[in-house]
Swiss-Prot record:
It comes from Saccharomyces cerevisiae (strain ATCC 204508 / S288c) (Baker's yeast). It is a peripheral membrane protein. Gene3D superfamilies: Phosphatidylinositol 3-kinase Catalytic Subunit, Chain A, domain 1. Residues 237-377 form the MPN domain. Keywords: Cytoplasm, Endoplasmic reticulum, Membrane, mRNA transport, Nucleus, Protein transport, Translocation, Transport. This is Nuclear protein localization protein 4. Substrate-recruiting cofactor of the CDC48-NPL4-UFD1 segregase. Assists CDC48 in the dislocation of misfolded, polyubiquitinated ERAD substrates that are subsequently delivered to the proteasome for degradation. Involved in the import of nuclear-targeted proteins into the nucleus and the export of poly(A) RNA out of the nucleus. Required for the proteasome-dependent processing/activation of MGA2 and SPT23 transcription factors leading to the subsequent expression of OLE1. Regulates ubiquitin-mediated mitochondria protein degradation. One of its GO terms (molecular function) is ubiquitin binding.
Length: 580
């Protein structure tokens, strides 16, 4: 698709995809503008003087998320750099390719794009692992030697000792950055991260026609060797309340059918791993679906449109879509609540189809990174499955898939197979070129050998395992929502639960009429209630904002006072009073 930009330099067209970050689109545009344009002052709007947004605020959102369509025109405004900066001191985009793999050497450091707050916070930390003075130390209490000096956050022995399977993303990033950008390199800079791309280059102009009529060593992808990814983008999944999971599982308990949902929350520091990140789950939203005993079906277009609306409303609450969760449960028939253990080391953990689903979701939710030459790297989107463990208990398992898995799926190189633990390698066609694919394994003699992956290979090579849990009961949780149950969840009509005025009256009316503001705050601080009230279109935009502030903010008293005095809220209470 093409997006048009009108500026004082004229009109420019930028080619992009729906899932491209807006920051990436702007990077492509900058090369066509005046070199003196100050990127930090970029603003865009649809009409002159209306709805002006700073580009830095939109950089980490996708083209689709912004609602942009093919041919849309945006007005770009910016200021020129001061005279003392026109020599190029602050230019961020210019880069030069230095080898055939596409590693780019920048003169002035990382890209200037907005990252997540947790990434900005962890970037400032060194992550060093402290060590106590040992018997080998020969110095005093104030001294330090090689036996007690802090370890780097990627230290292998520390992770093995503490049974941490993968190093954190920021530990991995610092390790790469330390090797790629040493002080002796002077002002030159090499992006330590680069997204793998296994697609054939159909725009190669190296003296031949494009694929499938021609091919050369520059446009065809190299042979791929799969291996376990050493890092993970997210280290831990934390569910703020156990009620969230219990209510989600209730759907299976009532119907015996499986259930799927999207998790909403945020990302924050995880202290149990050096420079770790945890995904904090505040709520689960279940899109429209038809549940079955061994799976479920969904209308993809219907779910896509509905989730775009939910994403916007969740964003107003300070939440984003951070993962997906689904059940795979079968009652063991013992009458004690036990379930079958289907997923284990001798069967599979995630099936090949589930791995492909996870990879597609991760590519739709890219992780913004100024240290990547593309402006993004992998994803923080997580996948959780609720199934039976070896003891027959209901348990949660959390995963991500590797950057190699994302690239394989994007290049359409793999598909599901009849064996859930194996991914089938697709054949080369006019649309795709599939190179040789290998994976490393230990043979019967314990020697690591390289195996040809065709026609299929174990999907475990694409998995990254995460830990999960709940906040410590000893410490106060900072959950955004006081209540997770009481008001029906969306799209549960098949279970005999529906969101309507009767349910809303049963849940809210008596409290709304009582004058007890503390209890009213507890009631409205419910993710599903907020979404339903918004769908009624009774409250004005300002009143909706007051409702959100009353529900999710720590200092909610003033906002709630204004809300209950508003015309929209009083209209809602009156409708509930008159409803049957």
């Amino acid at each position: 698709m093409l997006i048009r930009f009108r500026s004082k330099n004229g009109t420019h067209r930028v080619s992009c995809q729906e899932n491209d970050l807006f920051g990436t689109v702007i990077e492509k545009l900058v090369g066509n503008l005046d070199p003196n344009a100050d990127v930090d002052t970029f603003t865009v709007c649809e009409k002159p003087g209306q709805g002006i947004h700073a580009v830095s605020e939109l950089a980490d959102r996708t083209v689709m998320d912004l609602g942009l369509k093919h041919g849309d025109m945006l007005i770009l405004n910016y200021s020129d750099k001061p005279a003392n900066e026109k020599d190029g001191v602050n230019v961020e985009i210019g880069s030069v390719g230095i080898d055939s793999k596409g590693i780019r050497q920048h003169r002035y450091g990382p890209l200037r794009i907005k990252e997540l707050a947790v990434d900005e916070e962890l970037e400032k930390e060194d992550g060093l692992i402290p060590r106590q003075k040992s018997k080998l130390c020969k110095h005093g209490d104030r001294g330090m030697c090689e036996y007690c000096s802090p370890l780097p956050p990627w230290d292998k022995e520390y992770h093995e000792k503490n049974k941490i399977k993968h190093i954190s993303f920021h530990s991995y990033l610092k390790k790469l950055n330390e090797n790629a950008n040493k002080k002796e390199n002077g002002s030159s800079y090499i992006s330590p991260l680069s997204e793998p791309d296994f697609r054939i280059n159909k725009r190669c102009h190296n003296g031949h026609e494009p694929w499938p009529r021609g091919i050369c060593s520059k446009c065809q992808p190299s042979a791929i060797t799969l291996q376990q990814q050493e890092f993970r983008m997210v280290d831990h999944v934390e569910f703020q309340k156990s009620e969230i999971i219990n209510e989600f599982i209730q759907a299976w308990r009532y119907t015996g059918m499986q259930r799927f949902g999207y998790m909403y929350g945020s990302y924050s520091k995880y202290d149990n791993t050096p420079l770790g990140i945890k995904a904090v789950v505040e709520a689960i939203y279940e899109p429209p679906q038809h549940d079955e005993q061994d799976g479920l079906t969904m209308d993809v277009e219907q779910v896509k449109n509905e989730m775009l609306q939910i994403d916007r409303q969740a964003q107003e609450m300070g939440l984003s879509r951070i993962g997906l969760i689904f059940t795979d449960l079968s009652d063991a028939g013992a009458g004690d609540g036990s379930v079958f253990c289907k997923r284990h080391k001798d069967s599979f953990f995630l099936s090949s189809l589930e791995v492909i689903m996870a990879a597609r979701h991760q590519t739709r939710h890219p992780n913004v990174s100024k240290y990547s030459e593309q402006g993004f790297f992998s994803s923080k989107f997580v996948t959780c499955v609720i199934s039976g463990n070896l003891e027959g208990e209901i348990d949660i398992s959390s995963y991500q898939v590797s950057t190699e898995a994302e690239a394989l799926v994007t290049a359409d190189m793999i598909s599901g197979s009849t064996f859930p633990s194996m991914a089938y390698i697709n054949d080369t066609t006019d649309e795709r070129y599939v190179p040789e694919i290998f994976y490393m394994k230990s043979n019967e003699y314990g020697i690591t050998v390289k195996e040809n992956a065709k026609p299929a290979f174990p999907v475990d090579y694409l998995l990254v395992t995460l830990t999960h849990g709940f906040p410590n009961t000893d410490t106060e949780t900072n959950s955004k929502f006081v209540s997770s149950t009481g008001f029906p969840w969306s799209n549960r009509q098949a279970m005999g639960q529906s969101q309507d005025y009767q349910e809303l009256k049963k849940y809210l009316f008596n409290v709304a009429s009582s004058g007890d503001f503390n209890l009213l705050h507890e009631k409205i601080s419910n993710f599903h209630l907020l979404l339903y009230i918004n769908s009624l279109q009774i409250l004005s935009p300002d009143e909706w904002k007051l409702l959100i502030e009353s529900a999710v903010k720590n200092e909610w008293e003033e906002s709630l006072l204004k809300l209950v005095s508003s015309a929209g809220w009083q209209t809602l209470v009156m409708i509930l009073q008159e409803s049957g």
